[in-house]
Amino acid sequence: MCPVCQMALARVEGGFACAAGHNFDMAREGYVNLVLAQHRRSAAAGDPKESLRHRRVFLNAGHYAPLALALVDLLAAEAPQSILDVGCGEGYYLRQLAACAELADVDLYGTDVAKEAIRLAAKATPPVDCL
């Protein structure tokens, strides 16, 4: 949804746009920032880099793998057209979803207020649109 006019956003070359002409460009790292400049309270919103690094190490060690597999199985059985991971962090669950063959035709999206987290998610999950 467009943060300016609340119309639907569509994927366009280089980012996203709504029918009213509001455009949101994709950063070179592969994410799109939908937070309007006047609504930014801090350039460092969300988790600091060190917390993201620790979380990534913890998740990549497999501690939440059973949960991730159950989530993938549940969503694959539902056959959705798209999935939005709100608060996706660095994209751990999105990576699990993107790796599932049964979800290959599903549009995957991730959002997070932490600029560093969404940058990491976009870098680690290229088939996913990160906003």
Where do the language-model regions lie?
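Conserved alpha-helix/loop element of class I SAM-dependent methyltransferases that forms part
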Residues: 61-79
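Conserved SAM-binding loop of SAM-dependent methyltransferases across substrates and taxa
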Residues: 90-103
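Class I SAM-dependent methyltransferase Rossmann-like catalytic core
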Residues: 48-67
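Conserved SAM-binding loop
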Residues: 121
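Conserved class I S-adenosyl-L-methionine
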Residues: 80-89
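Conserved SAM-binding strand-loop segment of SAM-dependent methyltransferases
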Residues: 126-131
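Conserved SAM/SAH-binding beta-strand->alpha-helix loop
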Residues: 112-116
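N-terminal auxiliary segments of SAM/dcSAM-dependent transferases
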Residues: 1-44
